[in-house]
Curated annotation (Swiss-Prot):
NCBIfam families: GTPase_EngA, small_GTP. GO terms for biological process: ribosome biogenesis. PROSITE patterns: G_ENGA. Keywords: GTP-binding, Nucleotide-binding, Repeat, Ribosome biogenesis. This is GTPase Der. GTP 2 binds at residues 185-192, 232-236, 297-300.
Length: 465
């Protein structure tokens, strides 16, 4: 396992900016508003190819043990507790604070190897800044400006000198066999609670306060001999209610997670039914062409009448995606977890199935013979052949003539026919229709000598009259 380095400090000292600089990504949300980061976010630093290590970004410790601030602090402490090296980040512009003193006292009790990182030294007198933090008694001090990428090399040298060859960090691998699952939905429907339930630990901060999760956090999981990557995302609200820049970034990260996943689990709240915002999120999943499982959370607390009402609303509002399986779960109590994973497996298998050209052509031939396209204003579309065009979602490219007049109802017939024939569940199916260009359009066949002579005779005959 790779060594693990944790970034720890009070809010808004630049931990996420350092994380992005070390990992050469923009995986961590960065904003000048305190408290943007809440959950632990892991990445890999490969700036030194000989000594890669895992970096964990943590939320700022604000000195409050209650509510979201307390949950964020517990996440930061958990990260520091499992780290091989702690980078204690402070703000060089603001100087040492009483909160920095409290964090330092806790780090000394933790007794982990620690390096003091003074960030935001651009525009300051570095010697003055260093002297202010000298009372902390660190022999290992790095002064840098993460926003301008100044001092990152010096930080790497300090980190590299103190890392063990083997560490506590587990690398998020890129194993193609690992199923990538994104949990998406409105705020406060239970996404983080569900991920924590599946992991068996409080890996994500779960709270009744809407908008607790602000970033997309990926965690690897092995269950029943299979590999997964679970992606917890921020709740998506109506665009008119997204006011803060941080929340706009969070929404972007959620949409990005949908694009990168293989299966999207759309979480609904059984107590609220299907809202317009749920339909909007579903639209983003369908636009991305991702496999879909609908998870109806908080099902255990509903009466028989409420469940019947919820079922009726589900069939009316989500009837256009009746190919997606709906699973009734309780993230809090753990009911429905096995059924959820079974639905995810079926959706993933359908979305990634590889088709042969012969089997899809046979299916098209049977569909065509069973129900030929109708005549539209005297024109009938002809479907000549089809071939696979990709997976996730399954895509079929149909070639033929007069396909522009092929009605939408017939396209839906083909989709339903292929779904039934190949037992495709939980995934969109796309058809691309292409008309072959007529190679003789605009060209005339050259006349033979016999045809030329005949044409001359006809012309003489016409002139003679």
């Amino acid at each position: 396992m790779l060594p693990l380095v944790a970034l720890v400090g009070r809010p808004n000292v630049g931990k996420s900016t350092i994380f992005n600089a070390l990992t050469r990504t923009r995986d961590a949300l960065v904003h000048d508003q305190p408290g943007v980061t809440r959950d632990r976010n892991y990445g890999v630093c490969r700036l030194d190819e000989q000594q890669p290590f895992i970096v964990v970004d943590t939320g700022g410790i604000a000195g409050d043990e209650e509510g979201l601030a307390g949950a964020t602090a517990r996440q930061a402490r958990a990260a520091a507790g499992e780290a091989d090296l702690v980078l204690f980040v402070v703000d060089g512009r603001e100087g040492a604070s009483s909160l920095d003193d409290e964090i330092l006292a806790w780090l000394r009790k933790l007794a982990r190897p620690t390096v003091l990182v003074i960030n935001k030294i651009d525009g300051t007198d570095e010697e003055t800044v260093r002297s202010e933090f000298a009372r902390y008694g660190f022999s290992d001090v790095v002064a840098l400006s993460a926003a301008h990428r100044q001092g990152i090399d010096e930080l790497l040298d300090e980190v590299g000198a103190r890392l063990p060859e083997e560490g506590a960090g587990e690398l998020l691998d890129n194993d193609p066999a690992r199923v990538r699952i994104a949990f998406v939905g409105r705020p406060n429907v239970g996404k983080s609670t569900l991920v924590n339930r599946l992991l068996g630990e409080e890996r994500m901060i779960a709270s009744e306060v809407p908008g607790t999760t602000r970033d997309s956090i990926a965690v690897d999981l092995e269950r029943d001999g299979r590999q997964y990557r679970l992606i917890d995302t921020a709740g998506l609200r109506r665009r008119g209610k997204v006011e803060e820049a941080v929340e706009k970034f969070s929404a972007f990260k959620t949409l990005q997670a949908i694009e990168q996943c293989q299966v999207a689990v759309l979480m609904l709240d059984a107590t609220e039914g299907v809202t317009d915002q749920d339909a909007t999120i579903l639209g983003a999943i369908l636009d991305a062409g991702r496999a879909l499982v609908v998870a109806i959370n908080k099902w255990d607390g509903q009466s028989d009448y409420q469940r019947a009402q919820a079922e009726d609303l589900l069939s009316r509002k989500l009837g256009f995606v009746n190919w997606a399986e709906a699973v009734r779960i309780s993230a809090l109590h753990g009911s429905g977890m096995r059924e959820l994973f079974q639905a995810i497996h079926r959706a993933h298998a359908s979305a990634t199935h590889e088709f042969s050209t012969s089997e899809v052509n046979q299916a098209l031939e049977i569909a065509y013979e069973t129900n030929p396209p109708p005549s539209i204003r005297g024109h009938v579309s002809k479907l000549r052949y089809v071939h696979p065009g990709g997976a996730n979602p399954p895509t079929f490219i149909v070639h033929g003539t007069r396909l522009k007049v092929l009605p939408e109802s017939y396209k839906r017939y083909l989709e339903n026919f292929f779904r039934k024939r190949f037992k495709l569940v939980g995934t969109p199916v796309r058809f691309i229709f292409r008309e072959g260009a007529n190679p003789y359009e605009g060209k005339k066949n050259p006349l033979s000598d016999r045809q030329v002579a005949r044409k001359r005779r006809l012309m003489r005959h016409v002139k003679g009259k």
